[in-house]
A protein has these predicted regions:
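Long, terminal "pre-/pro-" and other extracytoplasmic accessory regions
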Residues: 1-119
């Protein structure tokens, strides 16, 4: 069901304001188990029902590594310093990150590279 941005959980609203301050919400939808948000720039964010983000993807511009915990960001920069982030998905104890070099890399919350594959 389509909702007003003010209908998003406070944690989701705060995350968008902090991480994408100049990118207004174009569309917000509430589903049974999550929320889907589209920003004006084309960035799409999926939130858990509690407002914590679970997936961010950007078809037109790279995502900032600052969206990741420091340990994960540092491991990614060390492995692929020139690659741009297109999608980030939170897993239970790791992150799945899609890069512009057609790689998907899996990094644990503490920065250990768990694996990668060519997409």
């Amino acid at each position: 069901m389509v909702i007003q941005p003010s209908g998003l959980p406070k944690a989701a609203q705060d995350f968008i304001k902090k991480s994408f301050p100049n990118d207004p919400i174009l569309y917000a939808e509430q589903n049974r188990k999550d929320f889907d948000v589209a920003l004006q720039s084309g960035i799409e964010i999926e939130f858990f029902i509690n407002g914590e983000w679970k997936e961010i993807k950007s078809p037109y511009q790279p995502l900032s590594a600052t969206l990741l915990p420091n340990a994960v960001s540092n491991a990614l920069k060390q492995k692929y310093p020139q690659a741009s982030i297109l999608k980030i998905e939170k897993q239970y104890s790791s992150y799945e990150i899609s890069l512009d070099n057609r790689r998907e890399i899996y990094i644990s919350n503490n920065g250990e590279v768990l694996g990668e594959k060519l997409d």
